[in-house]
């Protein structure tokens, strides 16, 4: 789990550095693979959609965002299904894992710790558990799309100069930035449904990093990007709820594990109060 968190944090930081660190004017360089095959087609498609909605680039961006999310949705659902399967295996293996972790805490020598860690790996192998085998691919696929979208907005004077609702698409908007951050914060809490308290603690840093990054970038990026995040985040929250409904009932042991951990935490809290 720690290794997976490190990978995801690296990916998110990479996206942040790419967006905030690239200060070149995209209109000055129209050549190259990225510009030719990603940025320009993106710009053309947004303008194409805008023609059908009265030249409203805000609505065109919303439609484009929903189309992007719909295209990525099968991959996200497949990843979510794999994650549910992994949670199910972890729930079944939990008694053995807890016993090994308890002995690992009591271990006094490095040799003893190494032997116990080998036992842990044996349990993972026994139940075919590999926490890092899924989870990063959808994020990696979205990164070039996000970058193309960002530069398509910056490189198009038509999009950048358009006003939608109360904000200009080419300029930062604090209110929309906060909305985008809050949407992804809500999405984080939705995504934690079904996870055990222990897993929620492990995922807390990486889970909160995404809305913080989105909020930070949206304060300085064109508001069209914050619009993309806000709409995409709402879609993702709905998709996550659908995923939980589709797959969680197939793995009742996940709910049992979560309920047992909640009951255990309540017992510990009551004991602490009595003291």
Swiss-Prot record:
GO BP annotations, alphabetical order: protein insertion into membrane; protein transport
Principal place of residence: membrane
Keyword RNA-binding on entry: no
Annotated compartments: Cell membrane
Organism domain of life: Bacteria
Residues that span the membrane, as ranges: 48-68, 132-152, 174-194, 212-232
Keyword field: Cell membrane, Chaperone, Lipoprotein, Membrane, Palmitate, Protein transport, Signal, Transmembrane, Transmembrane helix, Transport
GO molecular function: membrane insertase activity
Membrane topology according to the record: Multi-pass membrane protein
Signal peptide interval: 1-21
Covalently lipidated residues, kind N-palmitoyl cysteine: 22
GO cellular component, one term: plasma membrane
Lipidation (S-diacylglycerol cysteine): 22
Assigned protein family: Belongs to the OXA1/ALB3/YidC family. Type 2 subfamily.
Known function: Required for the insertion and/or proper folding and/or complex formation of integral membrane proteins into the membrane. Involved in integration of membrane proteins that insert both dependently and independently of the Sec translocase complex, as well as at least some lipoproteins.
Protein name: Membrane protein insertase YidC 1
Species annotation: Listeria innocua serovar 6a (strain ATCC BAA-680 / CLIP 11262)
């Amino acid at each position: 789990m720690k290794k997976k968190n490190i990978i995801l944090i690296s990916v998110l930081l990479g996206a942040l550095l790419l967006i905030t660190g690239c200060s070149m004017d995209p209109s000055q360089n129209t050549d190259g693979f990225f510009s030719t095959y990603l940025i320009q087609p993106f710009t053309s498609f947004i303008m194409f959609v805008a023609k059908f909605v009265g030249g409203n680039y805000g609505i065109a961006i919303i439609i484009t965002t929903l189309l992007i999310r719909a295209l990525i949705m099968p991959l996200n659902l497949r990843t979510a299904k794999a994650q549910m399967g992994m949670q199910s295996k972890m729930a079944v293996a939990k008694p053995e894992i807890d016993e090994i972790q308890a002995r690992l805490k009591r271990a006094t020598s490095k040799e003893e710790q190494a032997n116990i860690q080998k036992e842990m790996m044996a349990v993972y192998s026994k139940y075919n558990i590999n926490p890092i085998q899924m989870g990063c691919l959808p994020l990696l696929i979205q990164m070039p799309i996000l970058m193309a979208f960002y530069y398509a907005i910056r490189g198009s004077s038509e999009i950048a100069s358009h006003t939608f609702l109360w904000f200009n698409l080419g300029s930062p908007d604090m209110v929309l930035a906060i909305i985008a951050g809050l949407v992804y914060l809500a999405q984080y809490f939705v995504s934690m449904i079904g996870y055990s308290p222990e897993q929620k603690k492990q995922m807390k840093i990486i889970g909160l990093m995404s809305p913080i990054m989105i909020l930070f970038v949206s304060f300085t990026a064109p508001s069209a990007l914050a619009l993309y995040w806000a709409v995409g985040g709402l879609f993702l929250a709905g998709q996550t709820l659908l995923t939980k409904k589709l797959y969680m009932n197939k793995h009742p042991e996940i709910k049992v594990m979560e309920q047992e951990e909640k009951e255990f935490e309540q017992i510990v809290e009551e004991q602490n109060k009595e003291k």
